[in-house]
Amino acid sequence: MCAVALTVLGLAILFSSTVSLKADPYFFIKRQLVFVGLAVALGWVVSRLDLEYLRPYSWIIAGVAALALLAVLIPGIGVRVNGARRWVELGLMRGQPSELAKLAMVFALAHYCGINQRHMPSLVRGFIVPCAGIGLFGLLIIAEPDFGTAALTGVVGFAMLFLGGARLRYMVPTALGGLGLFALAVWHDPVRFGRITAFLDVEANRADGAYQLFQAILAFASGGLDGVGLGNGRQQMAFLPEAHTDFIFAIVGEELGLWFTLAAVTAFAVLFCAGLAHLRRAPNLFGYLLMAGSLLLLALQSLINLGVVTGSLPTKGMSLPFISYGGSNLLLMGIIIGLVFNTRREWSRPNLAPKRALMEVSA
């Protein structure tokens, strides 16, 4: 129900924030309704699949995802938007391979840890090999460039290794080294480094680097407790760039007020906690890690978007699950919800005796 409520909220705010952007006031809402229908259909299919049967195909799924990320970098196939090549043309629609690649990595990593459960404490099979896979996906995403999604992918991958039983003595130095390299890459990128300096002093940079964030803060301030009313916000009139995508939560705050923003955050929290409560019934390490990784994708992406829009994190283009306009992320969320229903049905069978899913983590 939380996912449905968030999607309905997203449709209402999307229509309000895009009604004046095109000659056809229903242009965006019609496309989003198509995406919602596809996400529901895909989620239903996933909820009926036998995930154990699909496990051997996880390498193929991951390989296809990696090829799709490579295709994005090929001129003529990949589409450059706002200086980044993250999209591919799919007939009349565009797709963002990095969205579905995140889940492909989760699926493959869960399968790998499951079949190598006894070897997860080892250096090579338990750490170096899976890290190479995580690193490959991360590098392909950085090449777009998309540092935020690459960081999200790396964090989720490392969390899964930790839950799968990889040794902290290998993980901690590698994580610190990776964080240092990531910071160095950002420092050498004028655009992304500029976002950080603008974030640190929004008032001084409100005319350029922090303009978008400044307008988002104004939107929240204008909305107050009860909002100015659906369709009555000023930020929908092109003051706030990307108001219907990455910064749509600011429109929620302006038009519906603090109470609705708190309700939306609560819905995300309930959705995540409900999934966590279900993890204890996982019959094996594969199921445990697949669900844990999927929930982490949902939770971290939500937290990053909310942090950016409220000025708690530097500006980063990342969709808000269920609410932002866009098909790729909505399909990803449909798959994740389908996985939740799938595991809920499969793990609730009375004759299914849960086995130990989480290995002891050794330092």
Predicted regions located by residue number:
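Extracytoplasmic/periplasmic regions of membrane proteins
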Residues: 214, 218-221, 228-229
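Hydrophobic alpha-helical transmembrane segments of multi-pass inner membrane proteins, especially
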Residues: 2-16, 21-214, 250-308, 335-339, ...
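Glycine/serine-rich anion-binding loops at beta->alpha junctions
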Residues: 91-101, 143-145, 224-229, 318-330
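Short, small-residue-rich loop/turn micro-motifs
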Residues: 13, 220, 224, 310
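Transmembrane helix boundary and interhelical junction motifs in multipass membrane proteins
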Residues: 146-151, 227-233, 243-245, 262, ...
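Long extracytoplasmic/lumenal interhelical loops at the membrane interface
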Residues: 224-259, 282
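Flexible glycine-/small-residue-rich
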Residues: 92, 218, 241
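Transmembrane alpha-helices of multi-pass inner-membrane enzymes
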Residues: 313-356
